[in-house]
Design a protein with these regions (language model features):
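C-terminal "cap" of GNAT-fold acetyltransferases
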Residues: 80, 115-129, 133-165
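Acetyl-CoA-dependent GNAT
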Residues: 4-10, 15-93, 99-112, 139-145, ...
């Protein structure tokens, strides 16, 4: 089941956020930064985020618990929507929940009038890049350098045309 996130989801969103980062980004970003991530600190961030959402945060559930989330909204580029984040708890990788969550995010962007969408992904994250490509996203031209956990990393942009409601 996919639904909009609610304030009561903050702790589960924090758990998914931390465990997915610590697993997916192992070897890709600063390990000390990953090791220092705590669910407690992320709960505070999610409490704040959910009270000031700049778009929509969708969650997917499995066995009555939040299994993943997708955050979407307007991009800085004119008319573009953006998938700000999509993460699944590692125990739910590879079973189709991510595909459904991404499709729901794309649909939400289309319903909000965005004709195309973008997302950013670490250039070294082969698993995520393959996932996006399987979902019809194509590599765009821009790259950017971001500082995550005290280390500079390269991100590439993926793009996809959207259909409306």
């Amino acid at each position: 089941m996919i639904r909009d996130a609610e304030p009561r989801d903050a702790a589960e969103l924090a758990r998914v956020h931390v465990t997915s980062w610590q697993t997916a980004y192992r070897g890709l970003i600063n390990q000390a930064f990953l090791d220092a991530m705590t669910i407690e600190s992320r709960i505070e961030r999610w409490d704040t985020l959910l009270s000031h959402v700049r778009g929509r945060v969708l969650v997917t559930e499995a066995d009555g618990k939040v299994a993943g989330f997708c955050s979407v909204g307007p991009a800085d580029a004119d008319g573009w929507g953006e998938v700000y984040a999509i993460y699944l708890a590692p125990e739910h990788w590879g079973v189709g929940l991510g595909r459904g969550l991404l499709e729901a995010g794309e649909k939400a962007l289309g319903e909000n009038g965005h004709g195309r969408a973008q997302l950013w992904v670490l250039s070294t994250n082969a698993r995520a890049r393959a996932f996006y490509q399987r979902q019809g996203w194509t590599l765009g031209r821009p790259i950017r350098i971001e500082n995550i956990g005290g280390s500079d990393v390269t991100e590439v942009r993926y793009e996809k045309p959207l259909t409306g409601p």
